[in-house]
Every structure is written in structure tokens, then in C-alpha cells.
Regions:
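N-terminal Rossmann-like NAD(P)+-binding subdomain of aldehyde/semialdehyde dehydrogenases
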Residues: 1-90
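Hydrophobic/basic alpha-helical segments enriched in Actinobacteria
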Residues: 30-40, 127-130, 135, 148-154, ...
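Acidic/glycine-enriched edge-of-secondary-structure segments
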Residues: 65-70, 94-97, 147
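Conserved small-residue-rich beta-alpha loop and adjacent elements
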Residues: 73-137
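Short, structured coil segments at secondary-structure junctions
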Residues: 118, 142-143
Length: 190
């Protein structure tokens, strides 16, 4: 893994041809098979799917995705000071959870801010296994296509590859991912 980490671009690095950010090449081997997501989607049934789609639509109703860069300058000639700031979406976001985690509504609550603010690269990472069917269905309906199964060590490697970077990490767990929380704090990943 370390060899791949040295040669692959960091998460959020733009592809030379498309200009869009992308995940490092090594993570593709850890992508969850689309067949699992399709199976979970079918098992969920129309009522469940409608509820999830309604929830995501409610998020969008109040805050449509804004993939914009805002540059603001303020000057105060009397004091001689000025301030300049640029606001833009983070280049990447990772929502990580364990295989035991099944709260689809909370997962949507964790991933929707990244969608709404226009984060171009969003990954859902199940640490140590395969996501539950309710989570796969929710991710599919939210439009999250980058769903991976990584070990603690692999997620740590991904976080280290993003440095220095202003991405975001959301951990949904009941204590099992505390080591990753501490590592993210040490790397200054919010």
C-alpha cells in the first residue's frame, strides 16, 4: 500500500485530462460492487425508497447545491486595514462508518451537507466490512457513487495522502473508530 501511496495523486488532486478531483488509484480496488447496491435498492421496496428520496429532496429544497467560489474583499481606508477571503467547497469529504451501523437517516444527515455545499469528491467508507443494506440504499438514492470498504489502516493511509488538504471527515460510530478520530485531529482534518 505504501508504494501506491507514493505514486498516486493525493485525494482531491485534479485529473490532468478532466480537471476534476479524484481519489488515489489504489482505492479503486476497495470499491463496493455495484451489484450489492442494486440488490439493496431492490430489497428496500418503493415505500422505503420514496421516504429516503423525500428526505433528500427536503434538504435540497432549503439549500440547493452551490458549487461556487466566493471572493470577498473589505477595506477600511480610515484605519488602513483590508481583509480578503475566498470561500469554496472542500475538495473532498469522507463519511466513515462500521458494518454494524444501520442508521440510514443519520448517514443521510452526515452526507447531505457535503452534497449541498458542492463538495466534488464524496466517499462513503465502511471500515472493516460491507455496509448494511439500508445504508447502501440511502447512499444510492443520495447519488453517492464512491462507496468503499477499507480497513482502519487503509483509511488512515487515505487521510495521510490528503495532507495538506482542507477536506472533511465524518465518523459515524459508537467508539470503534476513536483511533481514526484522534489521527484526523492530529492531521488537522475537521
Amino acid at each position: 500500500m505504501a508504494d501506491n501511496a507514493c505514486t498516486a495523486p493525493a485525494a482531491g488532486t485534479a485529473n490532468a485530462l478532466t480537471g476534476r478531483p479524484e481519489w488515489p488509484a489504489w482505492i479503486e480496488r476497495k470499491r463496493i460492487d455495484d451489484a450489492l447496491t442494486a440488490e439493496a435498492y431492490e430489497k428496500a421496496g418503493p415505500t422505503c425508497r420514496a421516504a429516503i428520496k423525500t428526505a433528500t429532496a427536503m434538504f435540497m429544497r432549503y439549500d440547493a447545491p452551490a458549487r461556487e467560489v466566493v471572493h470577498e474583499e473589505r477595506t477600511d481606508p480610515s484605519s488602513g486595514f483590508w481583509r480578503s477571503r475566498t470561500v469554496f467547497p472542500a475538495p473532498w469529504a469522507v463519511v466513515a462508518f462500521t458494518p454494524e451501523y444501520t442508521a440510514a437517516a443519520r448517514l443521510l444527515g452526515a452526507v447531505m451537507p457535503a452534497i449541498i455545499t458542492g463538495v466534488p469528491l464524496i466517499a462513503a467508507v465502511c471500515v472493516g466490512g460491507i455496509p448494511s443494506e439500508p445504508l447502501l440504499t440511502a447512499l444510492d438514492l443520495a447519488g453517492i457513487e464512491d462507496i468503499f470498504s477499507l480497513s482502519d489502516v487503509e483509511l488512515s493511509a487515505l487521510l495521510e495522502e490528503t495532507q495538506p488538504g482542507p477536506g472533511r471527515l465524518v465518523l459515524l460510530h459508537t467508539g470503534r473508530l476513536d483511533t481514526l478520530r484522534l489521527q484526523a485531529r492530529g492531521l488537522h482534518v475537521p
